[in-house]
């Protein structure tokens, strides 16, 4: 599981140092320039809190069977990328809640040790570490996407309605509502009370809320797209296929046979490639008897095989995501480990366009 600290995180570190460094220098003039080194330790503490949060997401995601791609820390904090296909409301909720819970545990541990820390820098660092972890836990539990609390809202609506797309849309709108509340609290209330919010507070509120609004909007769009997928039966776009051994020679294969698209498989029955009539027709007649299908097959990406689990919505999501990840023109689908058919990206796109009332693509 790769862990990345993006270069943009350095911007966040500089901001933290610029914020806390002057205060430390004022309280501890004896430190001199080292006060900013202590500020750097504050930034490292924040990085540790973020990485523990994201690692908790990753560990639980892997534990419930998802493939985890990476853990990333950046200027916005961090994120964990994983394939959420085949999830359930329960697994989605578990993955979401464990991040804030990990921060809460860290915060409580730091708070418990804090009274025993030496006065001065160690005590200040522990207190700050406890505070930032509790703050991260509380902020991430706000009930709207793209925050973890929004994932909990999505899981709850998904569980109640049986519709993952509806859960995503509702959680996205909740995310927009959270943005409005944060803006009112951070900027609106001070203005209404006659106070003037400082520039730093305004700038960071705007930046954070812009990020949250963008994430909420993307969630709504994704939910609507998932809703379209839910209206399509995968059987409509799956063409029958038949297995052809990679050891076969061309005379053994009729690519125009009515009983399925020829798919080359290995000795264990795993789909490897497609055969086309054009490729076979290009082989001279005098060579056909001894030309193996492996010489003319169109080998596909290793991830081109999609196992169908029997849930139409999840199967469609898996197909679309695999097309996006592999950029393949065709995917092989299996049921119970046995070749079941082939899906064309063009035919899938045409079926989705028809559902949405769009004109056929050229």
Predicted regions and their residues:
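Hydrophobic transmembrane alpha-helices and their immediate loop junctions
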Residues: 1-330, 334-362
């Amino acid at each position: 599981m790769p862990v990345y600290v993006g270069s943009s995180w350095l911007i966040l570190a500089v901001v933290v140092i610029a914020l806390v460094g002057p205060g430390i220098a004022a309280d501890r003039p004896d430190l001199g320039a080292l006060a900013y080194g202590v500020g750097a330790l504050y930034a490292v503490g924040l990085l540790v809190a973020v990485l523990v949060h994201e690692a908790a997401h990753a560990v639980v995601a892997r534990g419930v069977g998802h493939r985890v791609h990476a853990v990333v820390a950046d200027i916005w904090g961090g994120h964990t990328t994983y394939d959420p296909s085949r999830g359930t409301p329960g697994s989605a909720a578990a993955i979401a809640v464990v991040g804030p819970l990990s921060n809460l545990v860290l915060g409580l541990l730091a708070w418990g040790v804090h009274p025993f820390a030496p006065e001065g820098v160690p005590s200040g660092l522990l207190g700050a570490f406890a505070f930032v972890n509790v703050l991260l836990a509380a902020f991430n539990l706000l009930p709207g996407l793209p925050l973890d609390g929004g994932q909990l809202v999505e899981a709850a609506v998904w569980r109640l309605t049986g519709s993952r797309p509806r859960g995503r849309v509702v959680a996205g709108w909740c995310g927009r509502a959270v943005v409005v509340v944060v803006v009112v609290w951070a900027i609106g209330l001070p203005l209404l009370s006659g106070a003037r919010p400082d520039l730093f507070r305004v700038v960071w509120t705007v930046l954070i809320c812009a990020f949250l609004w963008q994430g909420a909007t993307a969630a709504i769009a994704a939910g609507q797209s998932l809703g379209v997928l839910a209206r399509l039966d995968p059987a409509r776009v799956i063409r029958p296929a038949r297995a052809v051994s990679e050891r076969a020679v061309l005379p053994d294969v009729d690519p125009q046979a009515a009983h399925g698209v020829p798919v080359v498989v290995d000795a264990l029955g795993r789909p490897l490639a497609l055969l086309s009539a054009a490729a076979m027709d290009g082989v001279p007649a005098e060579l056909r008897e001894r030309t193996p299908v492996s010489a003319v097959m169109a080998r596909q990406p290793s991830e081109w095989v999609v196992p169908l689990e029997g849930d139409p919505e999840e199967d469609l999501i898996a197909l679309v995501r695999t097309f996006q990840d592999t950029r393949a023109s065709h995917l092989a689908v299996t049921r119970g480990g046995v070749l079941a058919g082939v899906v064309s990206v063009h035919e899938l796109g045409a079926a989705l366009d028809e559902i949405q009332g769009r004109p056929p693509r050229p």
